[in-house]
UniProtKB/Swiss-Prot annotation:
<dbReference type="InterPro" id="IPR033911">
    <property type="entry name" value="MetRS_core"/>
</dbReference>
<keyword id="KW-0030">Aminoacyl-tRNA synthetase</keyword>
<dbReference type="Pfam" id="PF19303">
    <property type="entry name" value="Anticodon_3"/>
</dbReference>
<comment type="function">
    <text>Is required not only for elongation of protein synthesis but also for the initiation of all mRNA translation through initiator tRNA(fMet) aminoacylation.</text>
</comment>
<dbReference type="InterPro" id="IPR002547">
    <property type="entry name" value="tRNA-bd_dom"/>
</dbReference>
<comment type="subunit">
    <text>Homodimer.</text>
</comment>
<feature type="short sequence motif" description="'KMSKS' region">
    <location>
        <begin position="326"/>
        <end position="330"/>
    </location>
</feature>
<comment type="similarity">
    <text>Belongs to the class-I aminoacyl-tRNA synthetase family. MetG type 1 subfamily.</text>
</comment>
<dbReference type="InterPro" id="IPR009080">
    <property type="entry name" value="tRNAsynth_Ia_anticodon-bd"/>
</dbReference>
<keyword id="KW-0648">Protein biosynthesis</keyword>
<dbReference type="GO" id="GO:0006431">
    <property type="term" value="P:methionyl-tRNA aminoacylation"/>
</dbReference>
<keyword id="KW-0547">Nucleotide-binding</keyword>
<protein>
    <recommendedName>
        <fullName>Methionine--tRNA ligase</fullName>
        <ecNumber>6.1.1.10</ecNumber>
    </recommendedName>
</protein>
<dbReference type="InterPro" id="IPR015413">
    <property type="entry name" value="Methionyl/Leucyl_tRNA_Synth"/>
</dbReference>
<keyword id="KW-0436">Ligase</keyword>
<dbReference type="InterPro" id="IPR023458">
    <property type="entry name" value="Met-tRNA_ligase_1"/>
</dbReference>
<feature type="binding site">
    <location>
        <position position="143"/>
    </location>
    <ligand>
        <name>Zn(2+)</name>
    </ligand>
</feature>
Length: 676
């Protein structure tokens, strides 16, 4: 039997799961795992909470807690979130587990002994007040490239530039707010540059890497790879296993990857199995697109250094925005999984997160669209077809599937589509095209409703019983197929269908129990039709419509939480300006004529904007929100009387108005027209 190792990106243990986490990583991974189990693949799906790193350490110091106290809380919360969404993990562990410490240190030592890790003396910031070195997140200051304040020691959120703490202008310690100074420190570096050519060969030759993942990795490779720091001067983390490395821990990205393997090892040891057999056969990583870089360059190079098999694929899911705006936990613009599931079934979330957009694309969660899809697609389309099939069978055929009657071209075409569906869906899932597989299912159920309406079996039982028999037989056959091919997508709802069909039902809620790893219903059973005379049970509607008032409640709650956070940020509105001050701002309608990315920045675009009497060069931080091509000829609102500023070394002569989520404010006004 072939084996499969599936890993889910490690959730960081400083907060609960929100809907974006489920959409990009955990739901797709679960679909893939459930499908593979049903096809007979011995599947192991693992995850751990990521519990080290500076954000947790900084928070613990600010709250005067032990970091472990924080991670204890969120490990449990995150685990409950994933269980509630029926993510069928075989193992959910922690990077604070003893076995993880040992495996991560062994990995480091192996690379060190092979000569892939070396010592290097670097400049670091040191706080005299705290009497210690300051790793990245312990420092904030002004970005040297775009001059934005509040840039972290590892990255500027405004221009997207990756930073070192020593790059910051006017840095200050986040713990005591004092100004640090530069001191030299010995750290350990991984020879990433030595793996540049092998990485290129792996990425170019790997046909299983999704296009978005491959393209992202190639961009970084084209810029050349620099050696990568593996250690930090901290007291929270996994100690560097060398005699002369006291006070140093492994950088979180030097050990978090190992969380996949240590989680698997914990599970395997418990059940007297070998986790590496799964790894060596086929490994697939499910992650968010923000860590594609780490999983296609850092991690594979470490595996090459160790002499271990590389992943079969890395699947990077896109971002989820909320009501057209970027999610922000600090501003309350977020939906937590726990809150969502207080009102709605997990299958509704799973369905909506998959059907909304291809996994490799960013998408948006809208309460109105969620209601529309549940009511129109799940209730009126899928649920309606299944319920009317069951109801009609029970009412007119004594709860037994009738034998086939007359057989028209329409019947034959419908039957062929039913028989083809399992392979169609399987092909999509095999290629990580989960939305396309679900679309194929929903498209056929829509056709099935039309087929049912066109055949009019309610008239046929009186006027053409042979036609009615065929219609109801084929409709039941499709429902039987749906009870299997929908299992990876909406596992709880499927059990209700199977119960009516007298099929084996399974415990699909929560994490996977070892004794239940082998599914009771196999994928290929969808290719077998039920015999005439097969008896079904009585049925209830599978889904219910979501009323308008429920959606209104959720929207009101979302906006009230955001407003509450705004009030907490600034209770007294101390930054009010007068009408005279505002009158000095000149807003002009402009039209974007050219747009190009700025080398080295993930967020900034250089734009040429026609203002009527002149064309202005404007630098805007919208690269993560817009593709270059979609900006051309877009009419925008420009603040035209700002002093010139250099962002990332490029002069900007104006500013575009945009929302917090970087959505540009547009207008139908004439180019060059002033806005008052």
């Amino acid at each position: 039997m072939s084996k499969l190792f599936i890993s889910c990106a490690l959730p960081y243990a400083n907060g609960p799961c929100h809907l974006g986490h489920l959409r990009s990583t955990y739901i797709p991974a679960d679909i893939y795992a459930r499908y593979n189990r049903m096809t007979g693949v011995d599947t192991l799906m693992v995850c751990s909470t990521d519990e080290h790193g500076t954000p947790i350490a900084v928070r613990a110091e600010q709250e005067k807690k032990n970091p472990k106290d924080i991670t204890d809380i969120y490990h449990e919360i995150i685990g409950n979130d994933l269980k509630s969404c029926n993510i069928s993990l075989d193992s959910f562990r922690r990077t604070t587990d003893e076995i993880h410490y040992k495996m991560a240190q062994d990995f480091f030592l192996d690379l060190y002994n092979k000569g892939y890790i070396y010592e290097k003396v670097i400049d670091q910031l040191y706080c005299d007040e705290c009497k210690r070195s300051l790793p990245d997140r312990y420092v904030e200051g002004t970005c040297p490239y775009c001059e934005s304040e509040g840039a972290r020691g590892d990255q500027c959120e405004v221009c997207g530039r990756h930073l070192n703490p020593t790059d910051l202008v006017e840095p200050h310690c986040l713990i005591c707010d004092s100004t640090p100074h530069i001191e030299q420190s010995k750290q350990y570096y991984f020879k990433l540059h030595e793996f540049e050519q092998p990485l290129k060969e792996w990425i170019n030759s790997n046909e299983h890497l999704p296009k978005n993942v491959k393209n992202f990795a190639k961009e970084w490779l084209n810029d050349g790879l620099k050696d990568w720091i593996m250690t930090r001067d901290m007291n929270w983390g996994i100690p560097v296993p060398l005699n002369d490395a006291e006070g140093k821990v492994l950088y979180v990205w030097a050990e978090a990857f190992e969380g996949y393997q240590s989680s698997a090892a914990s599970w395997a040891n418990k059940h007297d199995l070998d986790w590496k057999e799964y790894w060596d056969d086929k490994t697939v990583h499910f992650i968010g697109k923000d860590i594609i870089y780490h999983h296609t360059l850092f991690w594979p190079s470490m595996l090459m250094g160790r002499g271990w098999n590389l992943p079969y694929s890395v699947v990077g899911g896109g971002y989820l925005s909320l009501e057209g705006r970027k999610m922000s936990t600090s501003k309350g613009w977020v939906i937590w999984v726990e809150d969502f599931l207080k009102k709605f079934d997990s299958d509704l979330l799973r369905y909506y997160m998959v059907i909304n957009a291809p996994l490799n694309k960013d998408t948006d969660f809208s309460w109105d669209d969620f209601q529309r899809r549940v009511n129109n697609e799940l209730t009126d389309n899928l649920g309606n077809f299944i319920h009317r099939t069951f109801t009609f069978t029970n009412k007119f055929f004594d709860g037994k599937i009738p034998e086939m009657g007359s057989y028209t071209d329409e019947d034959k075409e419908f039957e062929e589509k039913i028989k083809a569906l399992p392979d169609v869906v399987a092909n999509y899932i095999d290629n990580f095209q989960f939305r396309e597989g679900l679309q194929g299912i929903m498209s056929l159920t829509k056709e099935a409703n039309k087929y049912f309406n066109d055949k009019k079996p309610w008239k046929g039982v009186k006027e053409d019983i042979e036609s009615a028999k065929t219609c109801i037989n084929l409709s039941n056959q499709l429902v039987h197929v749906l009870s299997i091919v929908l299992t990876p997508y909406i596992p709880i709802s499927v059990q209700k269908i199977r119960k009516v069909l007298n099929m084996p039902t399974e415990h699909v809620d929560g994490f996977m129990k070892f004794e239940e790893r082998t599914p009771l219903v196999k994928w290929d059973e969808a290719k077998e039709f039920l015999p005439a005379g097969y008896e079904i049970n009585s049925a209830k509607p599978l889904f219910s419509k979501i009323p308008d008032e429920i959606i209104k409640e959720e929207k009101d709650k979302l906006y009230s939480l955001e407003e509450e956070n705004k009030e907490n940020e600034d209770d007294n509105m101390s930054d009010l300006i007068s009408i005279d001050e505002f009158g000095k701002v000149k807003l002009v309608v402009g039209q974007i004529k050219e747009a190009q990315k700025i080398d080295g920045s993930e967020n900034l675009l250089k734009l040429q904007v026609d203002l009527g009497k002149e064309v202005r060069q404007v630098v805007a931080g919208i690269a993560k929100r817009y593709e270059v091509d979609e900006l051309i000829d877009k009419k925008v609102i420009v603040v035209a009387n700002l002093q010139p500023a250099k962002l990332f070394g490029v002069e900007s002569n104006g500013m575009l108005l945009a929302t917090d989520s970087m959505e540009l404010l547009t207008t139908e006004g004439n180019v060059g027209e002033y806005i008052k």
